[in-house]
Amino acid sequence: MHKPRVLFLGRSTLDVLYRLDRMPEEDTKVYARELQTAPGGPALNAAVAHSLLGGRAMLISAVGGGPWAAPVRSQLRRHGVRLLDLARGTAYETPLCTVLANAANATRTIVNPPVSQVPLRHLGASWAAEMPSSWGRIPPVVLTDGFFLEETGALLAACKSAGAAICLDGGSWKPGTEELAGLLTAAICSERFAVPGQSGGANGNSDAVLEWFANRGVPYVAVTRGARSILASDRGRRFEVEVARIAATDTLGAGDVLHGAFCCHFALKPEFELALRRASEIATLSCRGPGAQAWARQPGGTVAESPQRALRSSL
């Protein structure tokens, strides 16, 4: 089986994770059950998940410098994820995010730092001119999380023109999403994704999201809803993907794992429903342990064989 190649574009962070028995009340002090720091961000986590499944991952992101950049770069090297840093040579610093994980109901709350105003590199439309030669040709699948669209829009359009499937990790609406829709092959959105002027939040209008993308020519659309079934549309055909019931201990990064696994499967066999079902299984598995990578590790700390076997069995 060849290694599927996928390009990921979007955000990288360093997350400081506090695992709590329950969320604290306002104006109180509490002690965490556990403290963990780990690189994060939708695109980074998806790229690492793709790599753990045996794929070749390339990441275009802003990492820059500052005290938090080193662990991010170290993790990418450890997992063989190749990086093109939009912030190279600038004063940009890797964002430090605080994550409160509530063990009582397996939810998480994230506090982001202020948005950086440091100008980043804008990529042109020529893959050969912009990318390292070692990256080879344009990959068959490209995922964007909606961050840095201004800096990467021309390259995304070039990838689309070359025949790549452009996929969106729609965690939330971001500036440029409407223009991006015309390039998309697939949009996989959170239930919190809301088109401006439409209802959103935890009980957002999933049907409206499916219709909005379909009306703009996106053939494959899905809305994830946590532990509830995934609602999806394959060129107008509606279906649901049931999510296995488990005793979830941590949902942090599960959506990112789903996107990385989807891209890995879709790059091998471009069948939307099959790739979505396989990705859902792996994302559910990721909720059994702490963090966005515990699903792929045995107790001894080595990468488990089961994810790769699951990938091969889907062919």
What residue ranges belong to the model's regions?
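Active-site metal-binding loops of divalent metal-dependent hydrolases
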Residues: S12, F147, V257
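Conserved N-terminal subdomain of the carbohydrate kinase-like
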Residues: T28-K29, T37, L52-P140, V303-L315
